[in-house]
From Swiss-Prot:
Keyword Metal-binding set for record: yes
Cofactor note: Binds 2 Ni(2+) ions per subunit.
Protein name: Urease
Species whose genome carries this gene: Cryptococcus neoformans var. neoformans serotype D (strain JEC21 / ATCC MYA-565) (Filobasidiella neoformans)
InterPro entries noted in UniProt: Amidohydro-rel, Metal-dep_hydrolase_composite, Metal_Hydrolase, Urease, Urease_alpha_N_dom, Urease_AS, Urease_asu, Urease_asu_c
Length: 833
C-alpha cells in the first residue's frame, strides 16, 4: 500500500466514523468525538467521490446530524469541523461551521456509502436544554466592566485620506499611525484608542470617524511605530520635537478646534468573557458535573489585558516591551488564565522563565501599561500561550504507581499527570503486586530508563526488611522513599525499621498494611508506627490493609491517608470487578480457598461507601491510581472529580459553598492529586501547585472537558502533549485532532524539563555522575516533620470506629454511608470506549 503518514492518520477518522455510524444505526446518540468523526469521515468520502466542490461540502457538512442525534452539549461544543482531502484539482481545506445547526439533520448524508439501515427519527426524541445546564456553562455577573478606568480621555476626529483601508489596534500609539490618516497628531501624543484590548478600529478610504482616545498607562516610554515620539513622554516635546517629526515625515495633521472629554468605556460582561475569559464574580460549570466555580479575583487590568494575534496587544511598542535583554523578560507568558488550585480560583497571567513559574499576576509592558507585576515583562524573547477561556491546574501527581510497562507513562501524561512516584522493574510478579524498585542495580536501570521520559519520577525502594543494610543501600542508590507491602510481610518490626531509616534519611514510607492481621490488628501497626509520619496507601482497604478497619487510621495526626482510584467513587459495578483484579495482581489462585477468603476480606461495600464520605470531609487527603495493580493511571483526575460530583449530589454543598458556588469543594479535591501528595513526598517546594518558584508543570482544560480531556500539557515550561491535527494540513486544527506528544516529549527535551526525585544521601554520593543521567536530580525534603495538619483542605481527623461484624464505619459518631452511584458524570459523554 505504501501509505503516507497523513493517510494512516485519516484511517483513525474512518474507523471511529464507521463505529459512530454503527452506534447511531442502533439508536445510540453520539458524543462529541463520535460526532466529529462521523461528519469528518463522511466529508472525506464525499471528497473521494469527486463530485462536490469545497463550497458545496462546507454546506453539506451541516446537513448530516441534528441535535436529536447527539448528546447534550455537543452542538454547543463543536464550533468548527475541518478536514483536508484530495480533490480532482489538488488537496484543499473544507471548513464546516456550526455543523449541528438543525434538529433533524439528514441521515441519508450521515449514512451515505455505509450500507447500514437508517434508523427512524422516532428513536431520537429532541430535547432542548436550558443554557445553564450546558457543559462548561458560564454565568456572568450583571454589572458592566469599565476599561481603562480613571484615565484622561478625549474625542478625536479622524479621516482616512488614503485609497486603502487602515486598521489601528488598541495599544498602538495613535500619533504614529499611517500618514494617510488626518487628525490632530499633536493632541494624540501619549494616547491610544479607548477600545477593548486586542480590538481595532478600521478606517475605510475617505471615511471620517470620531474615536475616543485614552492616555497610556505605565511609565509612558514609547518605542516602535513610525518613530515620531520615541522615548519618555514629555509635555514640552509636543510642540517642538514631535511637531517637527510629524511635519518632516509628511504625516497627515489637522488641528482640532474643539476637544471634548470622552466617556468611560464599558463592556458587557458576556462580551468581555468571550474575549478574555471569565472575571471576578463570574461562575463556570465544570464539564457535565453539578460543580460550579466562581472567579475569586482577577489580577489582570481591565483594558490592559495581554492579547496575542494580528493587530492585537502583544506587539512591539505596545504590550511587548522594546529593547530588553532576554534575561529581563519572560520566556513564556500564559495570558488571561483561569487558575484552579488549592490556594485559590482566580484569573491571572502566568510568567515562566527557565521552566519555572516566576510570576502570577499581570504581564505586559510596564513602559506603556498599568499594573504590570514585577518580573513579568513581555519582550521580543517571550513566547505566548493564549489562556483565555481555559482553566489551568497544576500537573497531577500519581504517587502509587507500579512501573509495570513504559506505556503507562504515555497514558499518564495524556491525562494530566506530570509526576509519578512508585516502584517496579517491569511486569515481574513482584512489581505487578508492589511498588518496589528493590536494589541498586534496578534503581540504576529504572532511573536510566526514564531519563528521557517527560515526567518527574520518584522511585521507592523495598522497605520490608527487619534489618537496615538493604534499606540504606537502596536509599543511597536513589530511592526517594520506602514501600512496606504486605506481600513482602508488613510486620510491626518491618514497619518500625523502615520508619527509623526514613527518619534518618528524610524520606517517606508508603504503607500497604497486613490484610491478614497475621502479626496483629490495626492497633499493632499503629503501635509500631509510634506516632511517626507515614503515608497510608488505599486507606479504605479494598486495595489492601488491615481487614476490616484500616480506615480508622484517618483519625491520627501522623498518618497521611490516600485512596486508590478503583473504588473512586463507589458505584454499582465497583464491587463486582474487584475479585478478579485482586486475584491477578496479588498472584492468588482461585483454586485455593484461603486465597479466595483473603480476597473477599478486602471487598466491603460499607467501607467503600465510607471512603466516599471521608474523601468529601477531607479525612482522606489524597487520591492515586495503583495502576495496573487494580487502579487506572489515566483516571486519577477523572475519578477524583467523579467523586466530588457524586458527593455534592448526595451531601449537598460544603460549608461555605452554595448550590452554584463549589469553590471549597473544588479546592479540596484538586488538592488531593496536586499539593497534598507533593507535601507528603517532600516535593512541594518545586511541584504540586501553581505558585511562583515551582516548575511550570501545568495542565490546560476547556471548561466543558474539565477533568476528562486536557487540551495541552506544559512540562517544565515546554509543551509536551497537546491536541493536534493532521501534520500535513495547512493549519493545525484539521481532523483527526488527537492527543499527541509534542517537542517537550522528545528525549533530549524531556531530560531538560523534568526531574528525578531522589534522596539527599544519593546526591551526596554523586548519583548523577555515577548513573550518567541527564535529568535534573532533586532531593526530597521535609518528609518527616509533617502531619495531617499540613494537608491542604484535607486535614480532618474525626474519631473513627468500625464495627467488626457489620463493617459499619462511624466518624465522630456519625455513620459514613452513601449508596452506590448508578450514573456518573465524565463517563459516556466523553469517552469512545
Amino acid at each position: 500500500m505504501h501509505l503516507l503518514p497523513r493517510e494512516t492518520d485519516k484511517l483513525i477518522v474512518t474507523t471511529l466514523g464507521t463505529l459512530a455510524q454503527r452506534r447511531l444505526a442502533r439508536g445510540l446518540i453520539l458524543n462529541r468525538a463520535e460526532t466529529i468523526a462521523l461528519i469528518s469521515s463522511q466529508l472525506q468520502e464525499f471528497i473521494r467521490d469527486g463530485r462536490h466542490s469545497v463550497a458545496e461540502l462546507m454546506d453539506l457538512g451541516k446537513k448530516m446530524l441534528g441535535r436529536r442525534h447527539v448528546r447534550k452539549g455537543v452542538p454547543e461544543s463543536i464550533h468548527t469541523i475541518q478536514v483536508e482531502g484530495t480533490f480532482p484539482d489538488g488537496v484543499f481545506l473544507v471548513t464546516v461551521d456550526d455543523p449541528i445547526s438543525s434538529d433533524d439533520g439528514d441521515l441519508n448524508n450521515a449514512f451515505y456509502g455505509s450500507f447500514l439501515p437508517i434508523p427512524s427519527a422516532d428513536v431520537f426524541p429532541a430535547a432542548p436544554e436550558p443554557a445553564d445546564t450546558l457543559l462548561g456553562a458560564l454565568i456572568c455577573r450583571k454589572e458592566p466592566i469599565k476599561i481603562n478606568a480613571s484615565r484622561r480621555r478625549f474625542k478625536l476626529e479622524v479621516k482616512n485620506a488614503g485609497d486603502r483601508p487602515i486598521q489601528v489596534g488598541s495599544h498602538y500609539h495613535f500619533l504614529e499611525t499611517n500618514p494617510a490618516l488626518i487628525f490632530d497628531r499633536l493632541l494624540s501624543y501619549g494616547y491610544h484608542l479607548d477600545i477593548p484590548a486586542g480590538t481595532a478600529v478600521r478606517f475605510e478610504p475617505g471615511e471620517k470617524k470620531t474615536v475616543t482616545m485614552v492616555e497610556f498607562g505605565g511609565k509612558k516610554i514609547f518605542h516602535g511605530g513610525s518613530g515620531l515620539a520615541s522615548g519618555s513622554f514629555d509635555e514640552n516635546l509636543r510642540e517642538t520635537k514631535v511637531k517637527e517629526m510629524v511635519e518632516k515625515g509628511g504625516f497627515g495633521h489637522k488641528d482640532q478646534e474643539k476637544v471634548e472629554e470622552g466617556p468611560t468605556t464599558e463592556m458587557n460582561r458576556e462580551v468581555y468573557a468571550s474575549m478574555f475569559g471569565p472575571t471576578t464574580g463570574d461562575k463556570i460549570k465544570l464539564a457535565d458535573m453539578d460543580l460550579w466555580i466562581e472567579v475569586e479575583k482577577d489580577y489582570t487590568v481591565y483594558g490592559e489585558e495581554c492579547k496575542f494575534g494580528g493587530g492585537k496587544v502583544l506587539r512591539d511598542g505596545g504590550g511587548q516591551a522594546s529593547g530588553r535583554h532576554e534575561h529581563e523578560v519572560l520566556d513564556l507568558v500564559i495570558t488571561n488564565a483561569l487558575i484552579v488550585d488549592w490556594n485559590g480560583i482566580y484569573k491571572a497571567d502566568i510568567g515562566v522563565k527557565n521552566g519555572i513559574i516566576v510570576g502570577i499576576g499581570k504581564a505586559g509592558n510596564p513602559d506603556m501599561m498599568d499594573g504590570v507585576t514585577d518580573g513579568m515583562i513581555v519582550g521580543s524573547s517571550t513566547e505566548v500561550i493564549a489562556g483565555e477561556k481555559l482553566i489551568i491546574t497544576a500537573g497531577a501527581l500519581d504517587v502509587h504507581v507500579h512501573y509495570i510497562c513504559p506505556q503507562l507513562m504515555t497514558e499518564a501524561l495524556a491525562s494530566g499527570i506530570t509526576t509519578v512516584v512508585g516502584g517496579g522493574t517491569g511486569p515481574a510478579d513482584g512489581s505487578n503486586a508492589t511498588t518496589c524498585t528493590s536494589s541498586s542495580f534496578y534503581m540504576q536501570n529504572m532511573i536510566k530508563a526514564t531519563d528521557t521520559v517527560p515526567l518527574n519520577f520518584g522511585f521507592t525502594g523495598k522497605g520490608n526488611d527487619s534489618g537496615t543494610n538493604a534499606l540504606r543501600d537502596v536509599i543511597e542508590a536513589g530511592a526517594c522513599g520506602l514501600k512496606v507491602h504486605e506481600d513482602w510481610g508488613a510486620t510491626p518490626e518491618v514497619i518500625d525499621r523502615a520508619l527509623s531509616i526514613a527518619d534518618e534519611y528524610d524520606v517517606q514510607v508508603n504503607l500497604h498494611s497486613d490484610t491478614l492481621n497475621e502479626s496483629g490488628y490495626v492497633e499493632s501497626t499503629l503501635a509500631a508506627i509510634k506516632g511517626r509520619t507515614i503515608h497510608s496507601y488505599h486507606t479504605e482497604g479494598a486495595g489492601g490493609g488491615h481487614a476490616p478497619d484500616i480506615i480508622v487510621v484517618c483519625e491520627y495526626e501522623n498518618v497521611l491517608p490516600s485512596s486508590t482510584n478503583p473504588t473512586r467513587p463507589y458505584a454499582v459495578n465497583t464491587l463486582d470487578e474487584h475479585l478478579d483484579m485482586l486475584m491477578v495482581c496479588h498472584h492468588l489462585d482461585k483454586s485455593i480457598p484461603e486465597d479466595i477468603a483473603f480476597a473477599d476480606s478486602r471487598i466491603r461495600s460499607e467501607t467503600v461507601a465510607a471512603e466516599d464520605v471521608l474523601q468529601d470531609t477531607g479525612a482522606i487527603s489524597m487520591i492515586s491510581s495503583d495502576c495496573q495493580a487494580m487502579g487506572r493511571i489515566g483516571e486519577v483526575i477523572t475519578r477524583t472529580w467523579r467523586t466530588a460530583a457524586k458527593m455534592k449530589q448526595f451531601r449537598g454543598p460544603l460549608e461555605g459553598d452554595e448550590p452554584t458556588r463549589d469553590n471549597n469543594r473544588v479546592k479540596r479535591y484538586v488538592a488531593k492529586y496536586t499539593i497534598n501528595p507533593a507535601i507528603t513526598h517532600g516535593m512541594s517546594h518545586l511541584i504540586g501547585q501553581v505558585a511562583v518558584g515551582c516548575l511550570a508543570d501545568l495542565v490546560f482544560w476547556t471548561a466543558e472537558s474539565f477533568g476528562a480531556r486536557p487540551e495541552m500539557i506544559l512540562k517544565g515550561g515546554v509543551i509536551a502533549w497537546a491536541a493536534m491535527g493532521d501534520a500535513n494540513a495547512s493549519i493545525p486544527t484539521v481532523q483527526p485532532v488527537i492527543g499527541r506528544p509534542m517537542w517537550g516529549s522528545q528525549p533530549e527535551a524531556a531530560a531538560l524539563n523534568s526531574i528525578v526525585w531522589v534522596s539527599q544521601a544519593s546526591l551526596d554520593k554523586d548519583l548523577v555522575k555515577r548513573f550518567n543521567i541527564k535529568k535534573r536530580a532533586e532531593a526530597v525534603k521535609n518528609c518527616r516533620a509533617i502531619g495531617k495538619k499540613d494537608m491542604k483542605w484535607n486535614d480532618s481527623m474525626p474519631k473513627m470506629t468500625v464495627d467488626p461484624e457489620t463493617y459499619d464505619v462511624h466518624a465522630d459518631g456519625v455513620l459514613c454511608d452513601v449508596p452506590p452511584a448508578d450514573k456518573l458524570p465524565l463517563t459516556k459523554r466523553y469517552f469512545v470506549y
